[in-house]
């Protein structure tokens, strides 16, 4: 009998491991989680509740930009928005907990609702008991990454979780962090909260994974359509409280010049770090890499810890790619590899195609990337053919009153294989699924039908396909 302990069973990664191993012949499974209520970050404080509140802001944004509508502009009722968000997310979290508890009803499966700590290599303490395991799966998620900024301890700040619970907001704000959370919540604070915001951007533009035109499009969209100012190539130096209860952030630019911004409230959207605190890894051979904000290497692609073949680390906690679909797939890989390792078989390495979506522009103008960007394809040595189209090139986007944005398709000029796609426009989040199929199957652009129903937004894909096909056939 092989005993597997899963720490963090309520989350997406941990529950994926549990679901795969529960009922497996010869496996004893102990699931542990101290969540109250449990349900995982995505459901409780991440991707699901954020879409709840963004949708309220999106409706107002679209009404504000449609001059065919008359009468007063509706306001977003923040209290009602938060109440509905809470009702729905608690329901979704309840389904996750019930699924885990149902697994624990199976023979050979136990659930312990308590904090888990390593006692030694493969002994875990939880619920006043010690469990000796053959394999331990760590799926403890992530926590807010609070930057080491002088003066930060002297001022009040709000994180993304605080924003999702906010029934009232001040007039002005300073934002540190313009990654996924910042790009989603900044327009929400502006549109739904009526705030005037200054957002610090360290680079020339946001969305470092995208080709430059997409980050430039986001900058233009936010500064032209929301009450948002985004100083670029700008770095925080220190922060201090103001006499009236606000905050003053001192910054320095790449050219050496300095400035100071003041606002009523500071918002920290500065990312998340692996949730390792209190886990007791110091009692094991496992030594995580120092956190830098970059992808980490202390966990192999087999999902085994670099320092211990019998400890598997999945989801946000491994510091690789903090996305739900990746966490689940890593969980499936870990479960499979535990069984393979136990019987002495070769292990499978987890590989995934780049597939990211940012719900920028309140989700009205989301950014998505599947596979390569033009830049990454060229860096990988491909001779590429590239097509770029503005959303406004296709009449349907104008007809639907969503004319902003663009899309790009990248193919291998030699054999026509579609290498990647990027979109920052209406329905780009939906089209990402189509491109996932195309890219992961390695389809030849010349074999893709260029016929969407007219008039529908995927006509932008037809144009990209035609242009790349012509380039390959030259």
Predicted feature residues:
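Glycine-rich flavin
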Residues: 2, 9, 16, 20-147, ...
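Short hydrophobic core segments
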Residues: 5-7, 116-117, 130-142, 175-176, ...
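FAD-site-proximal beta/loop scaffold in flavoenzymes
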Residues: 154-170, 262-337, 434
């Amino acid at each position: 009998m092989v005993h597997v302990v899963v720490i963090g069973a309520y989350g997406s990664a941990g529950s994926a491991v549990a679901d795969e191993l529960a009922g497996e012949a010869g496996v004893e499974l102990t699931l542990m989680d101290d969540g109250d209520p449990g349900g995982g970050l995505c459901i409780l404080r991440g991707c699901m509740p954020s879409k709840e509140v963004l949708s309220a802001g999106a409706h107002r944004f679209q009404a504000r930009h449609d001059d065919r509508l008359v009468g007063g502009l509706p306001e977003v009722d923040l209290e009602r928005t938060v109440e509905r968000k809470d009702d729905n997310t608690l329901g979704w979290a309840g389904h996750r907990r019930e699924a885990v508890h149902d697994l624990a009803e199976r023979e050979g499966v136990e659930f312990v609702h308590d904090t888990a700590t390593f006692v030694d290599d493969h002994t875990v303490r939880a619920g006043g008991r010690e469990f000796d395991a053959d394999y331990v799966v760590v799926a403890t998620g992530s926590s807010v990454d609070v930057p080491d900024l002088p003066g930060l301890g002297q001022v009040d700040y709000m994180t993304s979780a605080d924003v999702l619970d906010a029934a009232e907001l001040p007039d002005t704000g300073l934002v540190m962090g313009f990654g996924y959370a910042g790009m989603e919540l900044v327009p929400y604070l502006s549109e739904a909260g009526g705030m005037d915001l200054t957002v610090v951007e360290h680079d020339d533009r946001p969305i470092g994974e995208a080709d430059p035109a997409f980050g430039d499009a986001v900058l233009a969209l936010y500064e032209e359509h929301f009450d948002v100012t985004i100083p670029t190539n700008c770095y925080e130096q220190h922060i201090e409280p103001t006499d009236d209860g606000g905050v003053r952030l001192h910054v320095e630019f790449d050219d050496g010049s300095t400035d100071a911004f003041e606002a009523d409230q500071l918002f920290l959207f500065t990312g998340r770090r692996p949730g390792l605190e209190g886990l007791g890894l110091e009692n094991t051979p496992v030594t995580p890499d120092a956190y830098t904000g970059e992808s980490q290497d202390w966990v192999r692609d087999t999902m085994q810890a670099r320092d211990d073949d019998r400890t598997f680390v999945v989801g946000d906690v491994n510091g690789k790619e903090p996305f739900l679909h990746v966490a689940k797939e890593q969980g499936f890989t870990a479960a499979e590899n535990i069984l393979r390792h136990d019987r002495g078989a070769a292990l499978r390495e987890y590989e995934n195609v780049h597939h990211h979506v940012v719900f920028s522009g309140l989700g009205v103008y989301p950014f998505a990337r599947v596979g390569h960007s033009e830049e990454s394809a060229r860096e990988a040595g491909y001779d590429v053919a590239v097509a770029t189209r503005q959303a406004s090139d296709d009449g349907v986007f104008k007809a639907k009153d969503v004319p902003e944005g663009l899309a790009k398709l990248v193919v291998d000029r030699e054999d026509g294989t579609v290498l990647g796609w990027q979109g920052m426009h209406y329905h780009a989040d939906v089209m990402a699924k189509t491109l996932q199929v195309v890219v992961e199957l390695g389809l030849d652009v010349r074999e893709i039908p260029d016929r969407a129903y007219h008039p529908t937004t995927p006509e932008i894909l037809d144009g990209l396909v035609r242009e790349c096909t012509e380039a390959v056939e030259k």
